Amino acid sequence: MPTPKKGPRLASSPAHERLMLANMATSLFQNGRITTTLPKAKRLRPLAERLITFAKRGDLHSRRRVMRVIRNKSVVHILFTQIAEQMEQREGGYTRIVKIAPRVGDAAPAAVIELVTEPVAKKAVVKEAEAAAKVAEEEAPAVEAEATEAVEAPVEETAAAEAEAPAEEAADAEKAE
């Protein structure tokens, strides 16, 4: 039996695992959220995000790639029309996993995996970043000017001290004579 690419095997065979993940992805896209065990949710997340990325492309080849995994045409239609439009501004992170109380029957760690449908507040973040960059640029010349003055001032003081030092040595030499 080949070793799995990521994490422990969730089912008895690779084919069963692929089918189980495909069924969970179908349910996720139909309902928007599903409750499952934490390991299954963690294994479903990369598959669901990859399928949403294909849906955002929207071309025929991407639709056929999604149809390899999700066999239900109505769910594929929902994915390409509704979900892809909701995720248009989002650059990844299409799903969210929330841990919940352990399952009652066997105390397995349970989780809810859901689609993130909140709009991205990207423009406000960009404006704040630009404002911070402007402030940093304005402060940078002031800091450089202070650093230049600080470097020049000790040079003048040491030059004055060197000029005084020979005079003091000469005075000491005269006293010694």
Curated annotation (Swiss-Prot):
Record's GO cellular component terms: cytosolic large ribosomal subunit
Pfam families to which the protein is assigned, alphabetical: Ribosomal_L17
Keywords per UniProt: Ribonucleoprotein, Ribosomal protein
Compositionally biased intervals (Low complexity): 150-164
Alphabetical list of SUPFAM superfamilies matching this protein: Prokaryotic ribosomal protein L17 (SSF64263)
Residues covered by region (Disordered): 136-177
Protein name as annotated: Large ribosomal subunit protein bL17
Species for this entry: Bifidobacterium longum (strain NCC 2705)
